[in-house]
């Protein structure tokens, strides 16, 4: 299952994120895409880790309460790395976590929250997918004889392991 391929259509992506916010059970499995159930299960399993990343006292929740979403999502989305399925699923689960825990006293209506989260996230996913396709379509001759920028900047020790971020372990 390729999460980015499944999420190419905005309405499908939106439905998956919406479905993942429901409690586990027959309704979620029957009504929504199978990916919504997978993402929802990840959220339930990893909720403690998400709370470590964004505790209840974090400024993000105050911004959401006041209806400010552009700045937080700009910060979240610019650092987004989607090079493997684990990170893709973790990102979708994080979006679901944000929606599940959005402050109930927010000035943003429940219906608008979904689009405030999904629109910028889906746009970023599309940009990431297009860039990955372009890089994959480049002929091998472009890369011959060139050292890796990552190797030069980061050193070998960073190439052998995954991200230090607890969300993406």
Curated annotation (Swiss-Prot):
PROSITE patterns: BCL2_FAMILY (PS50062). The keyword Nucleus does not apply. One of its GO terms (biological process) is symbiont-mediated suppression of host apoptosis. Pfam families: Adeno_E1B_19K. Keywords: Early protein, Host-virus interaction, Inhibition of host apoptosis by viral BCL2-like protein, Modulation of host cell apoptosis by virus. Belongs to the adenoviridae E1B 19 kDa protein family. This is E1B protein, small T-antigen.
């Amino acid at each position: 299952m390729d999460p980015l391929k499944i999420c190419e259509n905005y309405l499908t992506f939106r439905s998956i994120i919406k479905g993942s916010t429901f409690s586990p059970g027959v309704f979620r499995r029957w009504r929504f895409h199978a990916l919504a159930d997978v993402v929802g299960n990840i959220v339930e399993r990893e909720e403690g880790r998400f709370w470590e990343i964004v505790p209840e006292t974090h400024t993000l929740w105050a911004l959401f309460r006041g209806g400010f979403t552009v700045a937080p999502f700009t910060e979240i989305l610019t650092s987004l790395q989607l090079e493997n399925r684990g990170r893709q699923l973790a990102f979708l689960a994080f979006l679901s976590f944000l929606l599940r825990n959005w402050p109930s006293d927010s000035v943003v209506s429940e219906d608008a929250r979904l689009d405030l989260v999904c629109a910028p996230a889906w746009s970023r996913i599309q940009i990431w997918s297009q860039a990955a396709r372009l890089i994959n379509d480049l002929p091998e001759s472009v890369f011959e004889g060139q050292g890796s920028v990552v190797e030069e900047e980061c050193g070998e020790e960073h190439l052998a392991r995954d991200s230090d971020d607890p969300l993406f372990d």
